[in-house]
Amino acid sequence: MNIHEYQGKDILRKFGVSVPKGIVAFSPAEARQAAEQLFEEQESNVVVVKAQIHAGGRGKAGGVKLAQSPEEAYEIAGQILGATLVTHQTGPEGKEVRRLLVEEGMNIEKEFYVGITLDRATSNNVLMVSTEGGMEIEKVAEETPDKILKIQIDPLHGLLGFQARQAAFFLELDGERFKNGVKFITALYNAYVSIDASLAEINPLVVTAEGRVLALDAKINFDSNALYRHKDFLELRDTGEEDPFEVEASKSNLNYVRLDGNVGCMVNGAGLAMGTMDMIQLAGGKPANFLDVGGTASPETVTEGFKIIMSDKNVKAILVNIFGGIVRCDRVAAGVIEAAKKVGLNLPVIVRLEGTNAEAAQTMLDESGLNLISANGLRDAAEKINEALAG
């Protein structure tokens, strides 16, 4: 689960992570009021008005601007709120701005990158720091990997003091800045572990002319499997920032990811789903989604899956590819038949069922009287997808 920058900063602040003063605003009037309050409390003569969307690259898209007065903050807020920002992370459709963060200005001396996430190759959390703050870390890793330091964190011991100091040395901090940097990194790790985050990314981490070390931006992602321990965080979820198809799928406990293709697919098991998507591509189509109905698929979940797939107007054909291990093929077939009657399938539907009760499932489909196309194996399914798209 992702949250907004201002929400992430509120959480980090509770763990002693230094962040600038900021106030969330939902209207130009609230932005002006926030700016007035910040100008009264700070010595700086500038505030920053920042669009709050679940994507990076906001500055380049015009979503981060400086204001030197409350009235200017009001005008900027009027320009940004309701606008659609298109960044390298939003896709061409962009994201509409519905809220802003008005934040105190900083006298920035240097910018760095600090992030903590799970390294799946080593099954450890990893601390990453870079001298190239404010840039896409993926681009830095590709072009100048020597500017990134990765420190593996033993889960039994956590982040040790010498590791935090090693990171601060790599960033070439000294004096009071070094102490503040070590304190910041330690607090960030403590927050990351305590809230069961899957990512805590500060880009940029800034050092001010006064020697302060602060998170100028913050990206926090939660491990969804641990949210039962942090039910208060569920209130931070902004479904308006998520794909509506994915939100609807989550209500039925379906693992769904929307793509930009023309062949909808319903599969059980992530590995088979990815293989099916490859096969669709090889057949000349393009997958419109990743949809894993899981091992406990029922007629109801299959019906919901079809409803979601059919809601995507780009879908021209549907492939159902099920291997009956835990899930029985006849239960899936019942769901396909029920969905066809409820939803009114008006697209070619290719069905390939193998495994437990596959023969019974095939009989159910044949006797249903519905226009369903049966496939024997992946090659046959690929050919029939090609025919369906060509027709």
Curated annotation (Swiss-Prot):
An example Gene Ontology molecular-function term:
ATP binding
Instruction: Cite the PROSITE patterns for this sequence.
Output: ATP_GRASP, SUCCINYL_COA_LIG_3
Pathway note: Carbohydrate metabolism; tricarboxylic acid cycle; succinate from succinyl-CoA (ligase route): step 1/1
Recorded GO cellular component terms are: cytosol; succinate-CoA ligase complex
One Gene Ontology term of the biological-process aspect is: succinyl-CoA metabolic process
Which residues of the sequence carry a binding annotation for substrate?
Answer: N268, G325, I326, V327
- One family from Pfam that matches here is ATP-grasp_2
This protein's source sits in the domain of life called: Bacteria
Binding note for cofactor = Binds 1 Mg(2+) ion per subunit.
| Catalyses which reaction(s) | succinate + ATP + CoA = succinyl-CoA + ADP + phosphate; GTP + succinate + CoA = succinyl-CoA + GDP + phosphate
Which residues of the sequence carry a binding annotation for Mg(2+)? N203, D217
Its keywords, alphabetically, are: ATP-binding, Ligase, Magnesium, Metal-binding, Nucleotide-binding, Tricarboxylic acid cycle
> Domain named ATP-grasp: which ranges?
9-248
Its Enzyme Commission number(s) read 6.2.1.5
Cofactor(s) the record lists: Mg(2+)
Name the positions where ATP binds.
Answer: K50, G57, R58, G59, E103, M106, E111
Q: How does it assemble?
A: Heterotetramer of two alpha and two beta subunits.
Give the record's family classification.
Belongs to the succinate/malate CoA ligase beta subunit family.
Q: What does this protein do?
A: Succinyl-CoA synthetase functions in the citric acid cycle (TCA), coupling the hydrolysis of succinyl-CoA to the synthesis of either ATP or GTP and thus represents the only step of substrate-level phosphorylation in the TCA. The beta subunit provides nucleotide specificity of the enzyme and binds the substrate succinate, while the binding sites for coenzyme A and phosphate are found in the alpha subunit.
Q: Which HAMAP family match?
A: Succ_CoA_beta
| Name of the protein in its database record | Succinate--CoA ligase [ADP-forming] subunit beta
Q: What is the lineage of its organism?
A: Bacteria, Pseudomonadati, Chlorobiota, Chlorobiia, Chlorobiales
The encoding gene:
sucC
